[in-house]
Design a protein with these regions (language model features):
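Cell-wall polysaccharide-cleaving catalytic domain and substrate-binding groove, primarily
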Residues: 1-131
Length: 131
């Protein structure tokens, strides 16, 4: 099992000062958040992408992936290509952050890239409902 799945943090959100809902009481991973269930990890990922749009003015899938997985530590181009192929959208598409289907598909594709296995869509949808 990958670290992201073990931590119920399928998109591998790094620890910082954010007090996410659904965090495990004991944060056993020094680098990445640990959530009590996968839907809370998906919720955090969805909220982060929405904040990229609302707070940082990042509108396109390309901008989101470049911020999420910067080239200094990730194969950003491969990540972007994988996500865009999975969701059937071009890299410069600007998805509506209020569109459940599109946002859940993007996050599911990101999870697949991060963990090497398809996301459990029921968990992704539960994450959306927790927003």
């Amino acid at each position: 099992m990958t670290r992201g799945l073990r931590n119920n943090n399928p998109l591998n959100i790094r620890r910082n000062n954010t007090k996410w809902q659904g965090l495990a009481k004991e944060q056993t991973d020094k680098a990445f958040f640990v959530f009590v269930a996968p839907e809370w990890g998906y919720r955090a990922a969805l909220r982060t992408l929405q904040n990229y749009h609302r707070v940082h003015g990042l509108m396109s899938i390309r901008q989101w992936i470049e911020r999420w997985a910067p080239p200094v530590e990730n194969p950003t181009d491969s990540y972007l290509k994988f996500v865009c192929e999975k969701v059937g959208m071009p890299a410069d598409a600007c998805p509506r952050i209020s569109n459940k289907t599109i946002m859940c598909n993007i996050v599911a594709a990101m999870s697949h890239f991060e963990n090497g296995v398809p996301a459990v869509m029921a968990d992704v949808h539960k994450g959306w409902e927790l927003l």
